[in-house]
Amino acid sequence: MASLDNLVARYQRCFNDQSLKNSTIELEIRFQQINFLLFKTVYEALVAQEIPSTISHSIRCIKKVHHENHCREKILPSENFYFKKQPLMFFKFSEPASLGCKVSLAIEQPIRKFILDSSVLVRLKNRTTFRVSELWKIELTIVKQLMGSEVSAKLTAFKTLLFDTPEQQTTKNMMSLINPDDEYLYEIEIEYTGKPESLTAADVIKIKNTVLTLISPNHLMLTAYHQAIEFIASHILSSEILLARIKSGKWGLKRLLPQVKSMTKADYMKFYPPVGYYITDKADGIRGIAVIQDTQIYVVADQLYSLGTTGIEPLKPTILDGEFMPEKKEFYGFDVIMYEGNLLTQQGFETRIETLSKGIKVLQAFNIKAEMKPFISLTSADPNVLLKNFESIFKKKTRPYSIDGIILVEPGNSYLNTNTFKWKPTWDNTLDFLVRKCPESLNVPEYAPKKGFSLHLLFVGISGELFKKLALNWCPGYTKLFPVTQRNQNYFPVQFQPSDFPLAFLYYHPDTSSFSDIDGKVLEMRCLKREINHVSWEIVKIREDRQQDLKTGGYFGNDFKTAELTWLNYMDPFSFEELAKGPSGMYFAGAKTGIYRAQTALISFIKQEIIQKISHQSWVIDLGIGKGQDLGRYLDAGVRHLVGIDKDQTALAELVYRKFSHATTRQHKHATNIYVLHQDLAEPAKEISEKVHQIYGFPKEGASSIVSNLFIHYLMKNTQQVENLAVLCHKLLQPGGMVWFTTMLGERVLELLHENRIELNEVWEARENEVVKFAIKRLFKEDILQETGQEIGVLLPFSNGDFYNEYLVNTAFLIKIFKHHGFSLVQKQSFKDWIPEFQNFSKSLYKILTEADKTWTSLFGFICLRKN
């Protein structure tokens, strides 16, 4: 506290400084992280205490002269007063719970009248002053700032809005007269008005805490809570930069700890069978860190829970990670950070778990209700053995808590780098939303009223950076629900808009519900049913424990990324049985080997060149998008809206994961809004088109382009499928829109089979070093290319040695059908024509391109068609 003591001492010396005898000396405490909700909370709390107050209106014009602010202020209806303001010293409280509180010492000195110019900053201030004592006054000010051309354009209008309200302003009606949508700043300041020689640093801290307690009655507890998080962080983090984020409050406990990842089928396939992993149950509790620090025993979770003391003698610190049951004050440990002063974070989980039981015994020695979670080490890949292991964890009836899932922990990594996955039954997957009642009279078709229901909108939190990278926009009515000051922060609410259900944020609340007033509350909810553009939501409970977090302006339910990744479990359900036998429906799950490096790079180069032809287009549809192998190419091309369609739910779930991966790890010049549609493209074009046109924001005239990379062979079974594809493209494209197909060329494949005299059920192979690299199995008798229906088996780089059946694409017939449905051929080209360009692109990769690679690549081609 030396710095604050020094500031107070200098304040007192100023009154003995003869050079300042004509100056006004101010000591003010300012809160810098104030939004409308916090401002309103403090304002209404002071009004409720019936503290004497006055309301004043003023206009201050500020002109920067060197390092000083030259001001002209008019406190209505008085005359203008000219002065300069010079800061002398400041002290900033470091604890996050202080909301950026700063103590400022400054002087004001009268100056001559000066001329205003275009650089002036104008501040209109509606101030309520509460005289809390003879020593202190608390000033709450609503401010509108104007600069440059705004001054002449908006000054009169905002004077009316701030000062000349239809109803006379009083402290009791002020908050109802001011519209938070009018882009105001909100300031809370405390000014000392007592005798200078009587002031102490303790007085400053006391009045600061008084205001913070109005915002949060548990302010002192919050301060202790953040100090406990700092203590834990000091043993986990070595980076001073990251520790600074903890100290500043930018990071909390959730950001500090390694997070459990909701496991999708695609995740599991990467390490199935999970031999070596540890499994335990997922208790229906909250994440908590149990700490023994000196003589104190506590748990840091959603708040600070004191569990007792060790007595007079301080102990070396022990820090355990686990799940906490607040009602029963029971702790269930699943990891250890420190044991009796020994740091364990750099050891693998298989080593840490050996010490965990010792840490639990330390807690038990002080009569703390603590247990170690039951773990099983998976040692067999046999599905039957795996099933028994998972059943022994998930279906155990003797646990003292409810089990709502299974945790899988990867061995061999440090504490922060340990990969931990969570599997939960679909029914137990829930999301936390900030719920707001939809404003009336918006005239938005999607917001159509329903009798017996009131429409509410569901929001989650998102960082400004992720909001931009995902190319999101605020939903209609957003600005009526959230003030501009909240929208301008680094973290703010956004409607829950997952890629496959852009309107999932609409919730029709039954008038008969036992949950009556839900506006402005955080609700835990689950999805009951998913229909076209409509989700049936069920309220599980009101998160009363989160209401205080809302007041800080930094919490709005789940984080957007967490919410959508949890949502994937509704999109692509992962059954309990699949934990043992492996995920079903994992098409092309294998990884490519190194022998395909050059050929894969060539195909990627060609697709990149093609997708660049549609750069910066507004709406693009990808038919058969799979798991988003081309997503990065669309992002590089600056496509604004991408609709990916596929019948493989697991692949689409992986695409959504990639969406976030690109947003957080890769730099793209432009942002792309991504939508996914789970749809079999062999179904009637009319039905598919209707679903696409119902995507929120999709243009009535259609998309600019349709792309389908290496997919249309699935739709060449018969003429009806080809006709259906052409009709679908016509319905989805705007006039002049383009279709871009890459495909294996049926005529070229047949030519290859003839050249090598491959008969029915025989296989053409391309070998390198006695290894089969490429292969085609002939599954048809005809000697000439049919319009449709001729099957081949293809050995693919990622098919783990298995043949996948597909139909030959008769490109002449395909083009004929598309012409019949209103398209013109723009270009048809073989992939082999790109090989010289690929050589210029990467000489090193071209050098390792083999003859087999070139032969295989020559079987593929590109077709471009334009809608007339």
Swiss-Prot record:
The keyword Nucleotidyltransferase applies. The record marks 627, 658, 713, 806 as: mRNA cap binding. One of its GO terms (cellular component) is virion component. Transmembrane segments: none annotated. The keyword DNA-binding does not apply. It is found in: Virion. Probably catalyzes the second reaction in the mRNA cap formation pathway. Forms a covalent complex with GTP. In the N-terminal section; belongs to the dsDNA virus mRNA guanylyltransferase family. In the C-terminal section; belongs to the class I-like SAM-binding methyltransferase superfamily. mRNA cap 0 methyltransferase family. The N-terminus contains the mRNA 5'-triphosphatase domain, the central part contains the mRNA guanylyltransferase, and C-terminus contains the methyltransferase domain. This is mRNA-capping enzyme. The lineage of its organism: Viruses, Varidnaviria, Bamfordvirae, Nucleocytoviricota, Pokkesviricetes.
